[in-house]
Amino acid sequence: MQRTSGVLLHISSLPSKFGIGSFGQSAYDFVDFLAKTGQQYWQILPLGTTSYGDSPYQSFSAFAGNTHFIDLDLLVEAGWLTEADYAGVDFGDHPEYVDYAKVYTERRPILEKAVANFLAKADKKDYQQFLADNYEWLEPYCEYMAIKEHYDLKPWFQWDPKATLRDEATIVHLRQQLADVLTYHRVVQYFFSIQWQALKKYANAQHIEIIGDMPIYVAADSVEMWMTPHYFKTSEDHQPSVVAGCPPDAFTADGQLWGNPIYNWDAMKADGYAWWITRLKESFKLYDVVRIDHFRGFESYWEIPFGDTTAINGEWVKGPGSDLFRAIRKELGDVKIIAEDLGFMTQEVIDMRDETGFPGMKIMQFGFGGGDSVDLPHNYVYNSVCYVGTHDNETGLGWFQDSADEASREFFNAYMRRGEDETVSHALNRGIAAAVSKMAIYTMQDLLNLGNEARMNVPSTLGNNWKWRMKSDALTDQLAEELLELTTTYCRLNPAFKAASEAAEVVEETKSTKTTEVQKAKKATTK
């Protein structure tokens, strides 16, 4: 049975001189790091546009890309900018945290200049093909963003009522008035696409696959909610009638109120789940594997009345279940999906996951609270993906230092037989590497032995999330050696790396044999 591993690091966390990670040289360097350490996967968070709060799970579109990730140096190479266009610009000077306000403010005029140069100089054949191939999602998105900017970035439900309800004459007038802004959004999506596809092509050539991430829900402030309200449970004015969240539990007395609109599954089923099939089809153009967030919501979901301030008054409502995934498989074949099956689990959710055949997830840091937890590695199953933690959790060291009580720490040390010289992070990484799961994914923070100062997200909080960045000197030879040793010891080497290593050994053995034979021949000649 094949065993593999990879690393979770979002694009925003790559080192960069532009205040936030990008599709530039650091991304290519990271692919090289993965390749030389025998990894098979690079897992990232959603690539979608981010809104207030900067969460990649709350996007203006289920399809459009985050233009923060467009690398400006690559635009120079393409001829659409010069380095002077951004020399001296302050994108945020902290090497370990993103300043989203500065990134948003400073990048826009630079990208506008690149767009103008592109439109003036470029051979637009590839661009026109991009527009044609992506028209179904691209044109509505560009229209939405242009009108949104016209109304000072307010969400669609705070626009003029005629624009909110898509009065035809109003929309035609706005499109004419905002033609240049629509064009800007088309072109920057093209820039995003060509840079990402080039990076993905490079990764795939190195036998590295990309694991992408798909939020189950769209944001209320999204083009989908504005353009296709019939796909959601709404009132007559197209506002959500119910919203998503999680019920109260031992950790949150009020539950979690996410506020996302909830799908009208009857309407989606009526057209054969066409929207979901299109969404996944487009996702597999971006990624090799897709992790679907909140997978249990397809079996049943927590539905909360719109306007409530907590999740207490919600109720469980049945979702489409396996019927959706049968329709997807019929159209797209055996797609590679990871089911994020964490949280409140029932036998019905487990049965749905098992029927699809998708691997679920295991989080090792959850396993040390006492008893024979399902999150302890000896209880994992092969068809699973194991983590120390994800973007929503503490780092391994952070968990040990800040959350684990003394009993949990003692249990962890005994369970992992951790010696005094082994770091907490390495012991946890060793735990998932040794597990039976077919895939182990390490977070970059855990590989670097970082604490909660490097945590990516604290759910249900705002203001200090999604900011962590890796230092430019983090990918050391020592780190590469440690990860390669871990990967080799627990038989998780990328098959391509293993084959290349074996081929190199054969070459070296052949060279050695030839050298020996030559030396023997020389000795025989001199006798």
Residues covered by each model-derived region:
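N-terminal regions that are enriched for targeting/export leaders
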Residues: 1-12, 28
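Alpha-amylase-like alpha-glycosidases and glucanotransferases acting on alpha-linked glucans and related
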Residues: 10, 16, 54-189, 218-441, ...
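Short alpha-helical segments and helix-capping/turn motifs at coil-helix boundaries
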Residues: 25-32, 194-202, 276-278, 424-428, ...
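Catalytic domains of carbohydrate-active enzymes, especially glycoside hydrolases
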Residues: 26-50, 286-287
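Surface-exposed amphipathic alpha-helices with a cationic face
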Residues: 35, 196-206, 329, 353-354
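Conserved, well-ordered alpha-helix/loop/beta-strand core segments that scaffold catalytic motifs
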Residues: 185-218
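Structured C-terminal cap/extension of enzyme domains
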Residues: 449-502, 508-514
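Long, low-complexity, intrinsically disordered segments
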Residues: 509-527
